[in-house]
Each structure stands twice: as C-alpha cells, then as structure tokens.
Amino acid sequence: MSSLSTSFDSSSDLPRSKSVDNTAASMKTGKYPKLENYRQYSDAQPIRHEALALKVDETKDSRHKFSSSNGENSGVENGGYVEKTNISTSGRMDFEGEAEAEAVKRYQLRSFALLSSNARPSRLAKSETHQKQIHVESIAPSLPKNAALERGHDTALPAGTSSNRCNLEASSSARTFTSARKASLVSAIFETSAESEHGTHPKQAKLKRRTYSTISTHSSVNPTTLLTRTASQKSDMGNDTRRIKPLRMDSRVSFHSEISQASRDSQETEEDVCFPMFRLLHTRVNGVDFDELEEYAQISNAERNLSLANHQRHSERTYNHTDQDTGFTNSASTSGSSAALKYTPEISRTLEKNCSVNEMYVSENNESVREDDKPDLHPDVTFGRNKIEGEKEGNDSSYSRAYYTLQNTEYQIPSRFSFFRSESDETVHASDIPSLISEGQTFYELFKGGDPTWWLDCSCPTDDEMRCIAKTFGIHPLTAEDIRMQETREKVELFKSYYFVCFHTFENDKESENYLEPINVYIVVFRSGVLTFHFDPISHCANVRRRVRQLRDYVSVNSDWLCYALIDDITDSFAPVIQSIEYEADSIDDSVFMTRDMDFAAMLQRIGESRRKTMTLMRLLSGKADVIKMFAKRCQDETNGIGPVLKSQTNMVNLQAEQENVNQNNSNNQISLSNSYMQTTSQPRGDIALYLGDIQDHLLTMFQNLLAYEKIFSRSHANYLAQLQVESFNSNNKVTEMLGKVTMLGTMLVPLNVITGLFGMNVKVPGRNGSIAWWYGILGVLLLLAVISWFLASYWIKKIDPPATLNEAAGSGAKSVISSFLPKRDKRFNDDSKNGNARVGVRRKSTVSLPSRYSRYN
C-alpha cells in the first residue's frame, strides 16, 4: 500500500511512457495553454475544514484500528499521525473519511470533462454544471464512504492503460520514501485503480486504508503525472457502465460521427449553431433508436388503458341512470369530435382489447382517482397548425358510451400508420404507433434490425408522435418543424444522415368539396429506409407499394428508388386531369361558333370552370420542375464526386492528417474516413438522376400543355363574348325595324287627324238638312287619302335599302329616324352596290383615275 504512494517531488522523476505521450498528443494541450496551466495547478484547490473538524474522533479511532491491522508500517503510520496533527494546527488540510472521498470526487469530476464529446477544448478543464449534478446523483448518500472507490472493480481495463499503470507502479515502488506526510492524492487514485485491476474485494478494500496525505502547494508539479492520472481515470470511468449511463442524457454522441469528434474545429462550428438537438438516450441500430419506440409504446399503452378504465367506470355509472340507447347524439354536439375521429387515433377499437399487462396496475390505481381529477373525454388534439379543441365532459352519457364502446357501432378507426418492407408481401396498417406491433413482438423485429429497405407512412401525426419519430430516426428540428407547420414551399434539403423532399399533390376525388386542393407530402429518405408524412388521405402510397411488389424482381428497390417512385406517382396523377381538360378545351373551342340559341350563362360558366382548373394545375406544377432539376443536379454532383460529400470528406481527411502528422497513411485514412462517413450520411444515388430526368420531362410537357389549353380557353372566351355582342346587335336591328313600321303607320294617320280636327271646330256641320250626301263625300275623301298615302309609302319603302355592313348600320343609327327613310340620291350606285363585281369595277376606275407619283415617270 505504501509503495504506491508518492509525493509530487518524487513524481517529477517518473519516466515518460509512450501511452502518456500518446494521451498528451491526442489532447493537444499545447494549443490551449490555459488548459495546461489549469491542470498543472489543479491540486491547489481548497477543501472545506468542516469535514475534518467533524471527523476528529472518527479519525483517531480509525488510526488506532489501522495501526493495529498493519504491523509492518506502524512506525511510518504513527509518524504520519503525529505529523498530521501538527499540520492540521498549522493550517494545512488533510483527507480523512468523507473528506478524502470528496477529494476523489473532485478529481473524477475533472475527468468527466474529457469524456464529454460535445465540450469545447477551452472548456475541458472546467466541470460543467450538468456533469456535476449527474455525478452527485450517481453517488447516493446511503453508499459507504468508499463507494466511489468500489465502482468499476469488475470491469476490465484497456491494455494500454494497464501497462502504463504497471510501469508507474514499478518505478514508484523502486524508490524510498522519506516521509509519509508528502503522499499525494495521485497515489490514492493509483491505489484505487490497482485494487480494481487485481480484483480486490470491497471488504478487503476497507482494511487497506491509505496514509493521510496533504496537498502540496509546491509550484513544480510534473504535468506527466497529471496526464497519467487523467488517462487512468478516463479508462476506469470509460469502462464503468453504471457511471456512463446517467451521463448519456447530456451527450450528443448520436449526432456526431467519428470525423466530427476528431476535428475540434468543426465541432466548435456545430456548437455555435444552437439547435435543440435531441440527446442520446439509447443505442442506434442502423440509424434507428428502437428503445425510444418501445418506451413510447409502453407509455401510450399505459395512458390508454388508464383512460379506458376511467371512462368505462364513468359510462357504467351513468348507464344506470339513463336509457339503454347507445346511438350517437345529434351532429351539433359532436361536430368537433367527428374531425378528431377523422384525423386522430381513438382510444381503442373495443373495450374487449383492454386485457394487457398494465391492466392490473390500472385497476389497482383506479380507486385513488377522484372524480375531479379525471381527464376529459376528448383531450385536445394538435397536429401542425390545426387544432381541435376537446369537448368537456358533460351529462351526455349516450355519446360517451357509444364513443368508447365501438363494438356497438359500425365505425372503423382510420389507419394512420403503414409499415412496409420491400421484400415483404404484407403491409402493416395501424391507427397509432404502438399498434404497429402485435402482442409479443418488438419494433426491432418489425424493422428487421433496420436493414434496408423499410418504409413508414404517417398520416396526420400528432405532436407527441412527431417528437417520438424525430428522436427515433434522428430527424433535425428544422425538418420536424417544417412537417408540423406544414411547409407549403416545395424544396429538397440535404442533411447529415438523410435528405428531405417536400412535394405537392392534390385531391383527385371529383365528388369532394376540396377537389384539386393541394396536399403537402413530406419525404425523409435515409440510407436504409423512408419516412413519409401527409395530413390528408392520399392513394400514392398504395400505388407505390403495388408497383414495388411488381418490379422488385427486376429493380433494386432501395430508399432512393422509393422516393423516385413516390414522386413519379404524384406526377402521373396529374395526367388524367390534364387529359380531361384537353377534351374540354376542344369541345368548347368547337361550340363557340356553332351554338347560337343555347343558354349563354351556362356556356360562360363552363368556360370559367375550365379556366379555373387549368390555372390551379399550373400553380401546382409551377415549382415542381425546378425542384426536380435541383434534385437531379445534386444526384449528378454526387456521381461526379464534386458534391458536398467529397468536400466534407476532403476537409476531414486534411484536418485529421494535420493533427496527427501522419504523412504515410493518408490514403488509408481517407478510405477509412470515407467509409465511416458514408455509413452515417445519406446522399441521393447518381443513377436516380436518370429517372428524375424522365419526371422532369413529364412535368415540362404537362406544363406546356396547360399553357396551350389556357390560351384556347382565353381565345374561346373572347370569341364567345364577341358572338354575344353580334347576337345583341341583331336583336337591336329587329327592334328598330319594327319601330320603323309603327312610325310609318303613325305618319299615315296624321293627315286624318287633321281633317277630323278641322271639322270639329265651330263651323257649319254638314247634315243639317235632311240629305246624306255630305256623309258620302267625307267618306270618299278619306278613302282617297288613304289610297294615295299607301302608294306613296310603298314607293318610299322600295327606295330605302337595309345596311349591308356594320359600318353602314352604325352610320344610319347616328341619323334621325326620318332621314333613314329618305331615298338614296344615286340610284345607279345603289344598284351596283348590290353586285360585288360592279363595286370592284368602280373602285378600280377610281383608283386608276387618281393621280400617282409613279405616273409622271411613264
């Protein structure tokens, strides 16, 4: 025991081993002088005197027991005790019992900073707050005083660390120690590691008490000893699973590859961008955290069983006071719940499925739940920007029983999650994540260990489900935010372990009120699988699964191919709608000039509806070509080796070679780094660019066709409006002709009114005498005037010609009504105007007779 203790003065002569050199080189303390100075004088930190003052009596008793148990070193130990008493009076501080364990904790805390993968080099010398809290919690107060020293006894140490420790023990045992007063705390840590190395039993560790040591404030401290101590602590704590387990809550190892750990500069850059990254809680297998899924399933099942038990008790209690009618209430009271039934999973299909492991626990705890503490019947449901407020628990018991006893209704819970594997003929459909696995099955078995190629389709995920999926598959918070907020912009984004595609489809049900409304589809493509998200029911996923089953014997179905197939199916869904628009455009274009007597309002509505559909499809297709073009370009860059993958690999290789100064193994390091990087990253394959080019051609063709159809509809609309104007003009001409005839009759009756008016004055009225000759005279005059007027009017009408052109009609409309009935002056011109050839001849004569500037040269 005493051979392992050494002072700081004697430790300065220790030989520098190779493992220590490697440790110092890997830590690069030369680049950080503050870190080296801090470690050099790290032992000069003060320790409380209260622990020593309170344990004076225990110290004396332990001295007596220790001196009696170790007879060989009794003289040295007693001398140490005497000197310890003098030292304590002189103001120096010792380690005894809990005070010594407290000092050991302080040195172990410093080693945590080296184990933290996301701490900057400038912060390695300081103990972070969360690390201190975890360490204090890891050492329970109920443990014995040497509980911290007993950890890691059963764990094997690395070969390099054990050999380094043996060399230091051999060099330290060969020396003689002049005083036990100068024993350092480094020897205490070496002693602890040596005991764990030889498998010392905890009972024997209690008997082997170390000599009391003081902290030397001498400035000449050998950094080699401190580095060796740090390396030994790191190896001990690295193999201690019980201590590393709580530390994983604050680590970010799952989001850092080997390259990012090797490059401290790139790590600092990543830490400067403060995103709420998820902490590593479990081990990932092929990029999937199956333990997270298992925990979420257990929590969901427990909450579901508890809620079912509470509502079952409530329904049974209220059923005794109400009728046995189990039907739904009116739609006014369940309007909000109907939307929840459409988009969110229900508690359970039937109450008969409550036989689970957690049912006993639920039945035991149900009695302690008060009526006021019961949850609402319908909790608030939140997905993205849409939120359905839950309905408060009321007196409507018939609805509650029917809502939670679905065996009495014909309603089926919608399947919002679908799991598919490329080599499987089955597709698992479930209403929530825990229902994806059957009883006795695990998610690891469902995913086949995460081997390619799997596909999980999620419809209307809730916030909790989205949070679980993001933690399970390592989705970046920006991607999760775009999905939850339902980002409308189409784009392609490349991340470290996946790439994210946002693509739009539409509602293709003609009977739906949301026909042709856009639907956002989000695709997250990993190296071994695909995640898809959408907030409306779509048929593209089923079409792609059917296509995979047909082509998997001929095509290598991987995650990139699934992404291409889904985009291609979305693109092909536009073809039937565009074809129907083409037929409609041809029909309208032909009907514009043929339909005269049809209802013009229906025709205008038909044209307007077709134009609206065309503009909607053009808006949906406008951004897709650019997205596919950018996607294909990145695939080609990845094939040519000029993409972001090669750039990051080259930078990492250069940094690794510069730090380690390895010039001969650059090619080997580059291959290993490339392989490790490719295992943790996901880039679109180069052969997918060929398929994407085909999709781009389809998109451009459809967009150009829509442009042509929109022009046809626009021209047809203008032509039909022109036809309506012509019809309106013809109707006005008919009305004008009728009014002209009425005017002619009125003109004929005006002279008759003059005659009757004249004879109505105070004149001699014929017939005073007894003869009736005056009567026949008046009647004859009237008839004569009528006949004369008729012949004159007929002759006048024959002289008037109807307008032959629209210009003549417009000119005649500007004249008065009487002037339009006047005959034309040039009768010959009017006769020739009826013959087109005669008019051309007149024009030719007038053209030749006019002077011309070319005639003078003849």
From Swiss-Prot:
Q: One Pfam match, by short name?
A: CorA
Q: Where would you find the membrane-spanning parts of this chain?
A: 742-762, 772-792
Entry GO CC? cell periphery; plasma membrane
Q: Where is the composition biased (Basic and acidic residues)?
A: 46-61, 367-379, 386-395
Q: Which gene encodes it?
A: ALR2
Q: Which CDD domains has this protein been placed in?
A: Alr1p-like
* GO BP of this protein: intracellular magnesium ion homeostasis; magnesium ion transport; monoatomic cation transport; transmembrane transport
Q: Which residues form a coiled coil?
A: none
Keywords attached to this Swiss-Prot or TrEMBL record, sorted alphabetically, are: Cell membrane, Magnesium, Membrane, Transmembrane, Transmembrane helix, Transport
Q: Which residue intervals are topologically Extracellular?
A: 763-771
Protein's cellular compartments: Cell membrane
Cytoplasmic topological intervals? 1-741, 793-858
Functional description taken from the UniProt entry: Plasma membrane magnesium transporter.
* Composition skew (Low complexity), residue ranges: 1-14, 67-81
Q: What is this protein called?
A: Magnesium transporter ALR2
Q: Which SUPFAM superfamilies match?
A: CorA soluble domain-like (SSF143865), Magnesium transport protein CorA, transmembrane region (SSF144083)
Which Gene Ontology terms cover its molecular function? Answer: inorganic cation transmembrane transporter activity; magnesium ion transmembrane transporter activity
The annotated region (Disordered) lies at 1-81, 318-337, 365-396
In terms of InterPro entries, this protein maps to: Alr1-like (IPR044089), CorA_cytoplasmic_dom (IPR045861), CorA_TM1_TM2 (IPR045863), MgTranspt_CorA/ZnTranspt_ZntB (IPR002523)
Q: Identify the PANTHER family for this entry.
A: MAGNESIUM AND COBALT TRANSPORT PROTEIN/MITOCHONDRIAL IMPORT INNER MEMBRANE TRANSLOCASE SUBUNIT TIM8, MAGNESIUM TRANSPORTER ALR1-RELATED
Gene source species: Saccharomyces cerevisiae (strain ATCC 204508 / S288c)
**Miscellaneous section:** Present with 2130 molecules/cell in log phase SD medium.
